[in-house]
């Protein structure tokens, strides 16, 4: 395929996605919910087809010596697919988010002012190794009246193509525009920048994957970008913090499957910490298969438990079951260190002191701050109506948990009295 053919193919996909978005305006919330349910049902009866395609991707990834974490994220199971179906069915059951009316932040004289939520337009999801994200993002987009363009990177092309085809079958069954969900194969657009640099036809780009991948895609984007964050979350262990609480916070944060978004990978230890509980924690984590690292001071104290962490590791995500420990002078120093080294999307403190918890909560510049509770991330939480695609650490309207609100924008309506 020539570069001209690839460019023409990309334009066709984006034009069709734009047309589908405009057509969705004529469908009500019940229609869109019915389509999300139809996509869920189409996926549910196609597990064998998806897993077969996924097997091809796994073979390719092994031949390419892909990183272990990417292979783990890539490998689909019936359980992961069933969880995706469950998320889509829950999305279908939620009230129409476009019917939400919010109070305006300010009012005009002699007029009533309010905000109505509206869809964004055409959303692009650019991701590596998470095939089921294609279906979840499709549900979020369709529920909010947006169209979605998928661009997988790495070795997930067969899985993405199969999932996209099945989602489009669901849209066809529901009699909604099939181009509401489309996939751009790597052979059609080998250069991702051709897609994410298209500000005239895309209204939002969501890069999802390793932090280095997300940053690379974000730097190439000309449309608005919503960066998903992962890993490198910090925990400050106060001398007033309970050992069992710290242990539970660390272990539970690594439970998310396949991507423990809020995994605690760094622990800052207060100077007044008793060595005995720290040894018990290190022993427990080692027994559970964690790899443990530390700064020079702690490695000297606990040579049987810790290996020395390089200086550049404190600002990077491990993305595996690795936790690094570091001493800190005091809470103020810990806050400054976290603000300059963590990913900034989910940081924690373990303490029995209200004053310390308040100082930490106000001082740490993170999207989510957890006090004496594991920062466990779940796309499909048991309680409430909220569902989440991921977490973002960027500043602005879409900071924090990426829910349905991230796929909508407010329109302010100013209504005066009729003079007729």
Swiss-Prot record:
It is an enzyme of class 1 (oxidoreductase). GO terms for biological process: L-proline biosynthetic process. One of its GO terms (cellular component) is cytoplasm. Pfam families: Aldedh (PF00171). It comes from the Bacteria. It catalyses: L-glutamate 5-semialdehyde + phosphate + NADP(+) = L-glutamyl 5-phosphate + NADPH + H(+). GO terms for molecular function: glutamate-5-semialdehyde dehydrogenase activity; NADP binding. It is found in: Cytoplasm. The keyword Cytoplasm applies. The keyword Amino-acid biosynthesis applies. InterPro entries: Ald_DH/histidinol_DH, Ald_DH_C, Ald_DH_N, Aldehyde_DH_dom, Glu-5-SA_DH, GPR_dom. Keywords: Amino-acid biosynthesis, Cytoplasm, NADP, Oxidoreductase, Proline biosynthesis. Pathway: Amino-acid biosynthesis; L-proline biosynthesis; L-glutamate 5-semialdehyde from L-glutamate: step 2/2. CDD domains: ALDH_F18-19_ProA-GPR. Its EC number is 1.2.1.41. Catalyzes the NADPH-dependent reduction of L-glutamate 5-phosphate into L-glutamate 5-semialdehyde and phosphate. The product spontaneously undergoes cyclization to form 1-pyrroline-5-carboxylate. HAMAP family: ProA (MF_00412). Belongs to the gamma-glutamyl phosphate reductase family. This is Gamma-glutamyl phosphate reductase 2. It comes from Synechocystis sp. (strain ATCC 27184 / PCC 6803 / Kazusa).
């Amino acid at each position: 395929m020539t570069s001209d053919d690839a460019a023409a193919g990309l334009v066709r996909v984006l034009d069709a996605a734009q047309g589908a978005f405009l057509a969705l305006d004529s469908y009500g919330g019940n229609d869109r919910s019915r389509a999300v349910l139809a996509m869920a049902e189409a996926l549910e009866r196609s597990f064998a087809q998806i897993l077969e395609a996924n097997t091809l991707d796994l073979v390719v990834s092994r031949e390419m010596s892909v990183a272990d974490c990417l292979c783990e994220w890539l490998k689909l199971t019936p359980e992961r697919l069933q969880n995706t179906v469950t998320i889509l069915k829950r999305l279908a059951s939620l009230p129409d988010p476009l019917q939400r009316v919010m109070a305006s932040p300010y009012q005009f004289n002699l007029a009533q002012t309010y905000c109505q939520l509206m869809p964004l337009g055409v959303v692009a999801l650019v991701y590596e190794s998470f095939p089921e994200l294609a279906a979840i993002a499709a549900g979020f987009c369709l529920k909010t009246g947006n169209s979605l363009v998928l661009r997988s990177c790495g070795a997930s092309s067969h899985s993405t193509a199969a999932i996209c085809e099945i989602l489009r079958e669901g849209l066809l069954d529901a009699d909604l525009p099939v181009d509401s969900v489309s996939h751009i194969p790597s052979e059609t657009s080998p250069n991702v920048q051709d897609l994410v640099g298209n500000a005239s036809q895309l209204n939002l780009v969501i890069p999802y994957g390793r932090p280095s991948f997300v940053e690379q895609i974000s730097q190439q984007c000309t449309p608005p970008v919503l960066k998903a964050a992962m890993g490198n979350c910090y925990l400050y262990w106060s001398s007033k913090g309970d050992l069992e609480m710290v242990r539970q916070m660390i272990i539970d944060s690594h439970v998310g499957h396949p991507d423990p978004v809020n995994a605690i990978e760094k622990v800052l230890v207060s100077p007044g910490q008793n060595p005995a509980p720290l040894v018990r924690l290190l022993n427990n984590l080692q027994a559970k298969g964690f790899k443990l690292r530390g700064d020079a001071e702690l490695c000297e104290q606990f040579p049987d438990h810790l290996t020395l962490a390089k200086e550049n590791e404190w600002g990077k995500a491990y993305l595996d079951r690795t936790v690094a420990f570091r001493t800190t002078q005091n809470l103020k120093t810990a806050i400054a260190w976290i603000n300059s080294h963590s990913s900034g999307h989910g940081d924690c403190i373990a303490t029995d002191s209200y004053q310390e918890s308040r100082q930490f909560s106000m001082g740490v510049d993170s999207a989510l701050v957890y006090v004496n509770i594991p920062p466990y991330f779940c796309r499909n939480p048991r309680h409430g109506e909220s569902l989440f695609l991921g977490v973002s650490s960027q500043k602005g309207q879409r900071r924090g948990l990426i829910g349905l609100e991230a796929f909508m924008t407010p329109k302010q309506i100013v209504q005066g009295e009729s003079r007729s």
